[in-house]
């Protein structure tokens, strides 16, 4: 039953459909097609475009998948874990910004290096900002 239906589609219905399509004899004939004829051609052209894409897809360049990469590239690499301790009482400024992207040349203080890092990688890292509470 299933194979008979499939055979009917390929032997009878598909050839009949292709015969009814308004395919012009020349390229100039495409200009003379009416809107209704273009609408009748649309499904056929869509299937051809899909088959063409599926045929060339294996040859298209692959998008590089972003791997998890190291964040800290150069600061205190000899230590197994980098920890900076700052006593809050020692904060003489009303506000201080500390680096969280590991790109700062004045680490642990933020110098805005995360802006370039974010632009290049699409990341959204920012500094840790400490403020004195106003009493």
Curated annotation (Swiss-Prot):
State where the protein is found: Endoplasmic reticulum membrane; Mitochondrion outer membrane
Q: Which residue stretches are annotated as topological domain Cytoplasmic?
A: 61-135
Q: Does the keyword Endoplasmic reticulum apply?
A: yes
Provide the cofactor list for this protein.
[2Fe-2S] cluster
Membrane topology, as annotated, equals: Single-pass membrane protein
As for family, the record states: Belongs to the CISD protein family. CISD2 subfamily.
The name of this protein is CDGSH iron-sulfur domain-containing protein 2B
Q: Which organism is it from?
A: Xenopus laevis
Q: What is the lineage of its organism?
A: Eukaryota, Metazoa, Chordata, Craniata, Vertebrata
Gene that specifies this protein: cisd2-b
């Amino acid at each position: 039953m299933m194979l008979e239906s499939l055979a009917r589609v390929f032997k009878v219905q598909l050839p009949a459909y292709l015969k009814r399509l308004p395919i012009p004899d020349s390229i100039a004939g495409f200009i003379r097609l009416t809107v209704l004829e273009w609408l009748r051609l649309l499904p056929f052209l869509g299937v051809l475009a899909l088959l063409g894409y599926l045929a060339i897809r294996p040859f298209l360049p692959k998008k590089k998948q972003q791997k998890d990469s190291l964040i800290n590239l150069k600061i205190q690499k000899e230590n197994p874990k980098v920890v900076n301790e700052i006593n809050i009482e020692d904060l003489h400024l009303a506000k201080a910004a500390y680096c969280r992207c590991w790109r700062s040349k004045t680490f642990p203080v933020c110098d805005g290096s995360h802006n370039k890092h974010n632009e290049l990688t699409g990341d959204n890292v920012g500094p840790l900002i400490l403020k004195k509470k106003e009493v």
